[in-house]
């Protein structure tokens, strides 16, 4: 397979994260290089957004995999005509109007959609080969999580392209589409929920007299270290949580207050509500 052109239509926050990750990916092996584009066209309809992309790209060094970047404004149709793979980084409510303007005449192009709630069935009305990807803002720094679902028309070679591109932002997992709204809530919205916890821990330290800088550092390291402990130990969070508690100690006292305030149920309900809204987004025209 020869290398190809990738068009990112709607190069906003997540589009820019993927642009940066793909462009700056470490040198690929000769076998893997075929899955990387030789050129990326970053498309935006708003000049201000195009300027942000231009500013981002101006800070790039030479791509380890020889990728070129072109920035386009109000030129989706031409960019898509040139591309073999299209990443759709649009808001859900404008996905279908834009797809109507960029037809896939021969059915050969691969469409990768980042839009929450817009189903494979909806997207397949315009493109035969479709993959849905839900990632999150840590992807901008290479620590993202990406959930992928494919339509039945996506071939193994196409799946390899999606996996290679998306894995550059962090961890890539494949799930059935029925899980995508839940993944949108857990993965896509998840950083905001974790940041609320981080902010609360920082402010608790500050309230008790720890300087803000040190409170921030402590809270970040506690979250980072705890996640790593769960990963390395292989034990459930519940088991590890009880290992921290001692009879009559500080930890169990704090946990009891949090249970009284509904912290755990609030987190679960918040994620469920985010999933419900994700499902609704794809139904709005």
Swiss-Prot record:
The lineage of its organism: Eukaryota, Fungi, Dikarya, Ascomycota, Saccharomycotina. It comes from the Eukaryota. It catalyses: L-proline + NADP(+) = (S)-1-pyrroline-5-carboxylate + NADPH + 2 H(+); L-proline + NAD(+) = (S)-1-pyrroline-5-carboxylate + NADH + 2 H(+). SUPFAM superfamilies: 6-phosphogluconate dehydrogenase C-terminal domain-like (SSF48179), NAD(P)-binding Rossmann-fold domains (SSF51735). Pathway: Amino-acid biosynthesis; L-proline biosynthesis; L-proline from L-glutamate 5-semialdehyde: step 1/1. The gene is PRO3. This is Pyrroline-5-carboxylate reductase. Its EC number is 1.5.1.2. It comes from Kluyveromyces lactis (strain ATCC 8585 / CBS 2359 / DSM 70799 / NBRC 1267 / NRRL Y-1140 / WM37) (Yeast). One of its GO terms (molecular function) is pyrroline-5-carboxylate reductase activity. GO terms for biological process: L-proline biosynthetic process. PROSITE patterns: P5CR (PS00521). It is an enzyme of class 1 (oxidoreductase). Keywords: Amino-acid biosynthesis, NADP, Oxidoreductase, Proline biosynthesis. The keyword Oxidoreductase applies. Belongs to the pyrroline-5-carboxylate reductase family. Homotetramer. Gene3D superfamilies: NAD(P)-binding Rossmann-like Domain (3.40.50.720), ProC C-terminal domain-like (1.10.3730.10).
